[in-house]
């Protein structure tokens, strides 16, 4: 099984504020855990918003993730899922944030379980398997 970690899971791990996430991450080989281009963009946005002394450290942490874990792109298959998911959520009147929609589409397209603490929002997406590693 592949696990796609959402930004909040990676941030908790990198900041060492979510020991449960770090523990669960250590239980899986790096080949079972992935990033995606949208999450990477969110992490890099956080790096750019960091104060100058912290920015170098944060950039190094994100670079280490990029070296250790595969990053899945938003490709044509994900675009197909995006269209279906967005149409479903729009019709149901239960839209989610635009970045979350892209992340969900990438997870579904690649058969990944999405690891997030934001289960309330992501649970609206049909066919998306979720796990919250921040829970004990």
Would you name each region that the model predicts?
Residues 24, 37, 61, 81, ...:
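Residue-level recognition of specific faces of alpha-helices
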Residues 9-10, 39, 78, 102, ...:
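Alpha-helix capping/helix-boundary segments
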Residues 45-48, 68-115:
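Active-site neighborhoods of divalent-metal-dependent phosphate/nucleic-acid chemistry enzymes
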Residues 1-36, 47-64, 91, 136:
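Short, well-structured N-terminal submotif of metal-dependent ribonuclease cores
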Residues 37-39, 75, 134:
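Residues at the C-termini of beta-strands that transition into short coil/loop
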